[in-house]
Amino acid sequence: MFPLTRCSGSGNRRFITVVFALLLSGASTPVFAKISCADLLHAQIPDVRIDTAEEIHPAPLWKFSGNALGGLGAAEVRVPFCRVSGVIEQEIAFELWLPDDWDQRYLGVGNGGDAGFINYSSLAYGVSRGFASASSNLGHWRSDPHWALGHPDRLENFEWRAHHLMAVNSKKLIALYYGSPAHHAYYEGCSGGGMGGMNEVQRFPADYDGVIAGASGTSFPGIAARWVLDKVLTQQDPASELKPDDWKRIAETAIQQCDALDGVKDGIIINPAACKFDIASTPGLTPAQVQHAKAILGPLAGRDGRTYFPALSPGALYSNFPEQGAFIPALSFGDWTYQDPNWNLANFDVARDVSAAEAVVPGVRIWDTDLVPFERLNHKLITYIGGEDPTVPTQANIDYYNAVVDRLGKPETDSFFRLFVVSGMGHCAGGTGPTDFGQPYLNEESHPQDAEHDVLAAMILWVEEGRAPSQFIASQSEAGKVIATRPICAYPMLPHFSGNGDVNSAANWSCTYLGEAQK
């Protein structure tokens, strides 16, 4: 658990009085004045309905199973807490977990994809670390893939309203339950959750003291457009279709050609900008397949000549979504943009449809570089992206960071905003080599939960003590045992092997500017 820090105001004086009395009596854990968990059922907060408020006492383990993207519907908790569920306004379902042993911090957690579920995995992670933690379905349930059709209000909830309302009302419930407000608020999310974090930074800078946003992209329509275009090209020329084995062979060929450029042959392209990979060199592809692959893996361009989304990094293992299931990329245009159930993806046009989507659903293009309101509050932002992310182009996050630097200058930007490119990592977590630094979608406990190894601990240290992170030590584990470590460097630095010692030890690596880093 992180150490308690003092906050100002009358609530702080009350807290100090209680702690002082407990110290005199020999008690070891602060006790907060609070109402009972069941009393929260009667909480009177405008536009908030509390449906359940139950005490959870693991004996010794409490398990919850649910269906959600990437296993985020499952949870295991070993600490006692008050589990609150309810609805904000009409459709924004949320849960707030309030630990008995509270560290006076609030953690809002994001979702993934187009949301529609409660992120129980990250709730469990937060409450186990002493945070009062909240998650929302963002105003709809993913059991209905057509949730946006006929409901433009749900799109607004999904984009930004639900995140903001969850933060505002969770803070009210926390203060009511504990008799004291959280002294700091943090947000952590990846993919769709990263988009939510960036919308909080850009639209509601006061909501969170620190935001950790992974693989946020900058354009949800840009992400969906790549998948839609893949299907359109296959419809237009079935002979050009690429199967999963073809995409895998393309990624493997890129790695074979560029792996050793960084001096270490380990299956990782540390500096994709230095890799001059030609898809045509992939064995076994027909000319039609080569052109198809170039259109999908390269910059997403329209007929107007404009690039609407960057290329994927060489080595990223691309895969498409099925045409049925919880999330269907084409619905980003048919349902979201045009509110047309009969929209046919055969008519898809990159320039027209991506532009229309970003205009109709502006919150899914998170490109506002005016972060001064967030900076002036002394709030902090950490973003990260996998070097081999097959969903969100690594370059998209780099381009956004560079755009903020162009606007504010490097010293001012670095005073509150850091980007980390995780070599070898895919989408949000996993991949090749050491990629675990405590990020969501992983929530493993094999790494130390300190600021050197854990992104959330580092954010707390930056916000509350002013010590900014310049690198993390990431780990790779097998059967719960760490088998390799390596630094993750603040952009534009990249990991560099010294040439001596064990390549699997971070002690033999440093963060270095390699000259031709992605810009």
Residue ranges, per PLM feature:
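N-terminal secretory signal peptides that target proteins for export/translocation
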Residues: 1-13
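Bacterial N-terminal signal peptides
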Residues: 16-27
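Cap/lid segment of the alpha/beta-hydrolase catalytic domain
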Residues: 70-72, 112-179, 225-226, 233, ...
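Glycine-rich nucleophile elbow surrounding the catalytic serine of serine-hydrolase chemistry
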Residues: 189-199
